[in-house]
């Protein structure tokens, strides 16, 4: 069950997807991330390629992308590896854009879309050979239930790869408040992700600290949006452009000061 704050976040996502698919925003995304999906995660093309290798997927594999948004990186992973793909998300607006993208690119792989919460996946147990999600858990309150649901639908001894932004343990009260202000809306967690993964029956194969590359990505995004500010103002309210710059500056500073981190996990089901 979604909290009221999560419901409000979902409503705002429709506005975000519309904004992210404006031509100038797609141009910025291509320059910074190497893709143009109007993505809601911070996954670059190079990181998506790494995810494909870590998942070990190929033709005949069934991949589940949870919280897939407009289809990045799931559609790209399916296109480059030949695996069959299922995209899951709420609300529907991002999935509609993913469907349009898939229709436009018309690949030979099978792609299914499901409107569902990550904590209540509508699939039978042991349905998938691989699971991925990109910066999803830091945008949800109930992180543990999502990890449990992914465990149930993944086949035994298969892998899940995901990225997540988190707040390091042991911060002072003032630094913790700064981290919450700079991170995604639900970045806070009572437990570390290593603990959450252990609690939900996952074995951690790799935990890659990708904070420095995320810091560089944030700086690149900030610089690129600043350089396109005049173009952005032609299609966007000045207050929105100003707020995005402030948010990027706040996140960059929090990352540089060690108040946020980003990890890429490779985990295996224990069942």
Language-model segments: residues:
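A short glycine-rich, Lys/Arg-flanked "PGG" loop and its adjoining helix->strand segment in the class I
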Residues: 144-159
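A short acidic, Gly/Pro-enriched loop at the edge of an enzyme's catalytic core
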Residues: 119-131
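N-terminal, positively charged/glycine-rich alpha-helical extensions of SAM-dependent methyltransferases
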Residues: 1-32
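Class I SAM-dependent methyltransferase SAM/SAH-binding core
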Residues: 62-120
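A short SAM/SAH-binding and catalytic strip from SAM-dependent methyltransferases
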Residues: 130-142
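Conserved Class I S-adenosyl-L-methionine
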Residues: 206-271
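Short, glycine-/aromatic-enriched active-site segment of Class I SAM-dependent methyltransferases
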Residues: 162-185
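Conserved alpha-helix/loop element of class I SAM-dependent methyltransferases that forms part
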Residues: 41-59
């Amino acid at each position: 069950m979604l909290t009221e704050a999560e419901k409000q976040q979902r409503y705002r996502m429709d506005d975000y997807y519309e904004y992210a698919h404006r031509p100038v925003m797609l141009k910025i995304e291509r320059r910074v991330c190497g893709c143009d999906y109007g993505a809601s995660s911070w996954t670059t093309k190079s990181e998506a390629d790494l995810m494909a290798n870590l998942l070990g997927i190929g033709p005949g594999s069934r991949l589940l992308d949870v919280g897939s948004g407009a289809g990045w990186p799931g559609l790209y992973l399916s296109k480059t590896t030949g695996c069959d793909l299922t995209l899951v998300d709420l609300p529907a607006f991002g999935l509609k854009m993913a469907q349009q993208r898939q229709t436009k690119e018309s690949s030979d792989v099978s792609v299914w879309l499901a409107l569902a919460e990550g904590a209540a996946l509508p699939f039978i147990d042991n349905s998938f050979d691989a699971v991925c999600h990109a910066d999803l858990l830091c945008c949800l309150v109930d992180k543990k239930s999502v990890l449990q649901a992914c465990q149930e639908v993944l086949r035994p001894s298969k892998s899940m790869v995901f990225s997540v932004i988190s707040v390091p343990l042991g911060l002072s009260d003032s630094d913790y408040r700064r981290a919450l202000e700079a991170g995604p809306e639900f970045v806070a967690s009572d437990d570390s992700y290593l603990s959450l993964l252990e609690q939900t029956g996952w074995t951690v194969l790799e935990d890659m600290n990708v904070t420095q590359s995320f810091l560089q990505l944030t700086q690149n995004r900030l610089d690129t949006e600043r350089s396109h500010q005049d173009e952005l103002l032609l299609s966007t309210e000045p207050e929105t452009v100003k707020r995005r710059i402030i948010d990027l500056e706040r996140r960059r500073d929090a990352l540089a000061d060690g108040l946020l981190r980003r990890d890429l996990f490779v985990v295996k089901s224990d069942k």
